[in-house]
Amino acid sequence: MAFLDNPTIILAHIRQSHVTSDDTGMCEMVLIDHDVDLEKTHPPSVPGDSGSEVQGSSGETQGYIYAQSVDITSSWDFGIRRRSNTAQRLERLRKERQNQIKCKNIQWKERNSKQSAQELKSLFEKKSLKEKPPSSGKQSILSVRLEQCPLQLNNPFNEYSKFDGKGHVGTTATKKIDVYLPLHSSQDRLLPMTVVTMASARVQDLIGLICWQYTSEGREPKLNDNVSAYCLHIAEDDGEVDTDFPPLDSNEPIHKFGFSTLALVEKYSSPGLTSKESLFVRINAAHGFSLIQVDNTKVTMKEILLKAVKRRKGSQKISGPQYRLEKQSEPNIAVDLESTLESQNAWEFCLVRENSSRADGVFEEDSQIDIATVQDMLSSHHYKSFKVSMIHRLRFTTDVQLGISGDKVEIDPVTNQKASTKFWIKQKPISIDCDLLCACDLAEEKSPSHAVFKLTYLSSHDYKHLYFESDAATVSEIVLKVNYILESRASTARADYLAQKQRKLNRRTSFSFQKEKKSGQQ
């Protein structure tokens, strides 16, 4: 047993003892108040009065003044009691009793009295269920749509319906295209079928979407189930297929092309434009002639006249002087435009301006056309590229790609030009419209491996010349192809160039004649 007379040590011991035994915390609060009262009753002593004794006692008790227990701190929740494990267990038992009150216990007892079969039958009496007559109600919209579209479920092109952009207008990038169908009858082919496709679709996907919409609308005749049997061509606003250009590449995205009018054309295995027999009508005009392709002999002469005038004026608006058609063998007799080609019994006509007549000898060209020449002239309008060298003024050359079609001539520099562009000016791309082309002549041919040709065109009211070199076979093919294009197009620039060239030749001839005459007189 220990005897302590220091109240501070005793208070600290009591606090430490109540850490684990006092759950209320009230003793701790009482003891703190007692410390405050103790300080008031024992003020600090005056220095000098038994200073050594006070200093000794204060040195021993300095660490215990207001010493509280280690685990108890003074805060706003100082007097809040933490729940013990016993209280938590009692709370859990209380909740279990409440849940038991909500449950109802029913005791199962065996049935002692036996009931007869009639009593059991009366308990579960069979009900008579009468069959309801079929209701003649209104059909749902879904049933009506399924009856109206019996081919929708059997559409072989359903996989391409996901590229239909009609439900995505305004939310996703789409593209609206008018598609002409040359495989239709003569009446239906005049009206295009509007297709809205996703901008991310490829050309092959667009062909499948066109076939899907064509089949869904129940059009005739039926299409081939293979999408690869069709291709897309550029078409005019009136539905005429532009065969001068190849079909669109099926692997390219459709947003790459800016055409709003296309035509769905069936592919053919044989070379050429189609496997069917091609029919051509020759239209003679001033400074050249044109070959108009027709599908059959049932076409009217009015359609042939419109195509001939459009071919003559090119991209210009069809306005100004009016024209008429005459048979080549019957001058000054206009052809009935409402009649068909079959009733004319002729394949060669002449395009004459109204209120005028054919001059003598203007159209005295040979009417006999070799079929090989016709095929060469038709193929000349198809796009083809050649790799040649362009000759500049200082006689240095630049490798270029020369692309020739029925509408324009494109000159694109080859990208790999490190040697030529290091010291010289880089060649820029050039595009020349065929209406501005004037002539294409062979300049020189030194050997089978080297030849030079000259291309003349109109630029800003002045004639410019471009010189190219390549092997003799390539140069000969290019010159022949360009001349076929020039002969089939009635170009004003070419006519003016030939007239100017003829005037220079006449002036030179007259000058040499006068010079010879003067020398003879002397």
Swiss-Prot record:
The record gives the membrane topology as:
Peripheral membrane protein
Q: Could you describe the post-translational modifications of this protein?
A: Phosphorylation at Ser-128 by PKC promotes relocalization to the perinuclear region, where the mTORC2 complex specifically mediates phosphorylation of SGK1. Phosphorylated at Thr-86 by AKT1 or RPS6KB1 in the presence of growth factors; the effect of this phosphorylation is however unclear. According to two studies, phosphorylation at Thr-86 by AKT1 is part of a positive feedback loop that increases mTORC2 activation. According to another study, phosphorylation at Thr-86 and Thr-398 by RPS6KB1 promotes dissociation from the mTORC2 complex, leading to inhibit mTORC2 signaling.
**Mainly localized where?**
membrane
The UniProt record gives the binding positions of a 1,2-diacyl-sn-glycero-3-phospho-(1D-myo-inositol-3,4,5-trisphosphate) as R393, K428, K464
Phenotype reported upon loss of the gene: Death during early embryonic stages.
Annotated spans, Interaction with ATF2:
468-522
Residues the record lists as N-acetylalanine modifications: A2
The segment(s) forming the CRIM domain are 139-267
Q: Region entry SIN1-type RBD: which residue ranges?
A: 279-353
Which CDD domains does the record cross-reference, listed alphabetically? PH_Avo1
Q: Where does tissue-level expression of this protein occur?
A: Uniquitously expressed, with highest levels in testis, kidney and liver. Present in renal tubule cells (at protein level).
What biological-process GO terms show up in the record? Answer: cellular response to insulin stimulus; cellular response to nutrient levels; cytoskeleton organization; negative regulation of apoptotic process; negative regulation of Ras protein signal transduction; positive regulation of cell growth; positive regulation of peptidyl-serine phosphorylation; regulation of cellular response to oxidative stress
Task: Tell me the Pfam families matching this sequence.
Answer: CRIM, SIN1, SIN1_PH
Which residues lie within the region annotated Disordered?
38-59
Reading the lineage from the top rank, the first entry is Eukaryota
* Activity regulation details: Phosphatidylinositol 3,4,5-trisphosphate (PI(3,4,5)P3) promotes MTOR activation by relieving MAPKAP1/SIN1-mediated inhibition of MTOR that takes place in absence of PI(3,4,5)P3.
* Keywords assigned by UniProt, alphabetized: Acetylation, Cell membrane, Cytoplasm, Endoplasmic reticulum, Endosome, Golgi apparatus, Lysosome, Membrane, Mitochondrion, Mitochondrion outer membrane, Nucleus, Phosphoprotein, Stress response
According to the UniProt record, where is the region Interaction with MAP3K2?
A: 2-184
Question: What's the stated role of this polypeptide?
Answer: Component of the mechanistic target of rapamycin complex 2 (mTORC2), which transduces signals from growth factors to pathways involved in proliferation, cytoskeletal organization, lipogenesis and anabolic output. In response to growth factors, mTORC2 phosphorylates and activates AGC protein kinase family members, including AKT (AKT1, AKT2 and AKT3), PKC (PRKCA, PRKCB and PRKCE) and SGK1. In contrast to mTORC1, mTORC2 is nutrient-insensitive.
Q: Which PANTHER family match?
A: TARGET OF RAPAMYCIN COMPLEX 2 SUBUNIT MAPKAP1 (PTHR13335:SF1)
What assembly does the database describe for this protein? Answer: Component of the mechanistic target of rapamycin complex 2 (mTORC2), consisting in two heterotretramers composed of MTOR, MLST8, RICTOR and MAPKAP1/SIN1. The mTORC2 core complex associates with PRR5/PROTOR1 and/or PRR5L/PROTOR2. Contrary to mTORC1, mTORC2 does not bind to and is not sensitive to FKBP12-rapamycin. Interacts with MAP3K2. Interacts with ATF2. Interacts with MAPK8. Interacts with GTP-bound HRAS and KRAS; inhibiting their activity. Interacts with IFNAR2.
| UniProt protein name | Target of rapamycin complex 2 subunit MAPKAP1
Q: What species is given as this protein's source?
A: Mus musculus
